[in-house]
């Protein structure tokens, strides 16, 4: 846990999933402080929109203004709810919207934590363009190293005149005034042909590797199990290309597409609808924090290409949680398959959780691993 003192309220905040006590990661950053400083003396009129509030620092600080928290992360929503409870703030004080929803009209203040992907930022700025006015206070913040010329140009192109502040604690802010510059329409998704198939893969803005098949997934697809029955999970499904391939290779199985990103799950659904519509009755789509709340002993296999970062921070906490959830939800003698960068040493992590791990394939960068849920371990 960490403490954030600001001009609105003193907060105790924690990350979600929680980090270990040996190497704790903070649930807020200097950019959050810097953004809140700008509002200390500002009279807030109209709706407050907060975009990409990773762990709820801004939403908790401004809870008395009934803000809207907008983003593409279910884990961020869970983190914000947890931090609201931790600070004794009514959860109903914050309204949650995903990035593709309609934003409230004529906001008084818009606070943006600049996301990792420029595509998501552009989608969000285009959505804001439909609702902000010239009187809306628009401020974005990030680590100074994460604000590039391309970031500023995007604000200018979509919304209007843009300036930056001096760096403070290695954070920098962007101030923008809306003046409705001319702007061409943009497609909601980016599409590309999947090599070796007749499939077209569609990707919403925040999907990992949205402009082409990532090399880890490409390697994984060469080693997917075939002719399974029952329910298979594509955990952290992204655009669903792994799950789509599983539907094709396992015609007697049902595939459950799971991701914490609403855009990822929407992309997966779209890709099944457009490429294998006959398999929709063998498909389920779930926005979730890994397999939280899913009954144990349900699945015949889980396949996962786990992330090794959360927001801008490198961490294996999300992967660790995925592995534990997979073990709980697998049937006895059923298997977890993962692909990962070799340097992450997930072999020993899986062996610790499952009691076993086998290397299926390896190349100079990636490894495909398999762990079996054995009946003797509880």
Curated annotation (Swiss-Prot):
Compartments (UniProt record): Cytoplasm
Keyword Phosphoprotein in annotation: no
Keyword list, A-Z: Cytoplasm, Methyltransferase, rRNA processing, S-adenosyl-L-methionine, Transferase
Catalytic activity field: guanosine(1835) in 23S rRNA + S-adenosyl-L-methionine = N(2)-methylguanosine(1835) in 23S rRNA + S-adenosyl-L-homocysteine + H(+)
Molecular functions per Gene Ontology: 23S rRNA (guanine(1835)-N(2))-methyltransferase activity; nucleic acid binding
Enzyme superclass (EC): transferase
Assigned GO CC terms: cytoplasm
Keyword presence, rRNA processing: yes
EC number: 2.1.1.174
Coiled-coil ranges per UniProt: none
Covalent S-S links between cysteines: none
Known function: Specifically methylates the guanine in position 1835 (m2G1835) of 23S rRNA.
Family according to the record: Belongs to the methyltransferase superfamily. RlmG family.
PANTHER family (alphabetical): RIBOSOMAL RNA LARGE SUBUNIT METHYLTRANSFERASE G, RIBOSOMAL RNA SMALL SUBUNIT METHYLTRANSFERASE C
Protein name, per record: Ribosomal RNA large subunit methyltransferase G
Organism from which the protein derives: Shigella boydii serotype 18 (strain CDC 3083-94 / BS512)
Organism classification: Bacteria, Pseudomonadati, Pseudomonadota, Gammaproteobacteria, Enterobacterales
């Amino acid at each position: 846990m960490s403490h954030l003192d600001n001009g609105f309220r003193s907060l105790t905040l924690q990350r979600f999933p929680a980090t270990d006590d040996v190497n704790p990661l903070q649930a807020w950053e200097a950019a959050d402080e810097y953004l809140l400083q700008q509002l200390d003396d500002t009279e807030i009129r109209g709706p407050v929109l907060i975009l990409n509030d990773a762990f709820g620092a801004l939403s908790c600080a401004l809870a008395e203004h009934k803000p809207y928290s907008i983003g593409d992360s279910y884990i961020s929503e869970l983190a914000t709810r947890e931090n609201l409870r931790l600070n004794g703030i009514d959860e109903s004080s914050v309204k949650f919207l995903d990035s593709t929803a309609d934003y409230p009209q004529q906001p008084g203040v818009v606070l943006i934590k600049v996301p990792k992907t420029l595509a998501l930022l552009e989608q969000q700025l285009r959505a804001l363009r439909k609702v902000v006015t010239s009187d809306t206070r628009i401020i974005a913040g990030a680590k100074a190293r994460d604000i590039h010329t391309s970031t500023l140009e995007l604000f200018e192109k979509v919304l209007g005149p843009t300036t930056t502040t001096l760096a403070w604690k290695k954070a920098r802010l962007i101030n923008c005034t809306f003046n409705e510059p001319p702007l061409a329409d943009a497609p909601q998704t980016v599409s590309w042909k999947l090599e070796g198939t007749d499939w077209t893969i569609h990707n919403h803005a925040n999907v990992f590797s949205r402009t082409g098949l990532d090399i880890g997934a490409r390697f994984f697809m060469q080693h997917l199990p075939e002719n399974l029955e029952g329910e298979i999970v594509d955990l952290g499904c992204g655009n669903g290309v792994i799950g789509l391939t599983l539907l094709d290779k396992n015609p007697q199985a049902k595939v459950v597409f799971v991701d914490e990103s609403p855009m990822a799950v929407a992309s997966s659904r779209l890709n099944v609808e457009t490429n294998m519509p006959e398999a929709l009755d063998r498909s389920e789509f779930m926005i979730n924090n890994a397999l939280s709340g899913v009954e144990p002993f349900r699945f015949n296999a889980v396949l996962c290409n786990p992330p090794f970062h959360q927001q801008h921070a490198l961490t294996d906490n999300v992967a660790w949680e995925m592995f534990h959830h997979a073990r709980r939800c697998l049937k006895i003698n059923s298997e977890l398959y993962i692909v990962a960068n070799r340097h992450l040493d997930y072999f020993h992590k899986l062996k610790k959780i499952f009691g076993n791990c086998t290397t299926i394939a390896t190349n100079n960068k990636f490894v495909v691993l398999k762990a079996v849920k054995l009946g003797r371990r509880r």
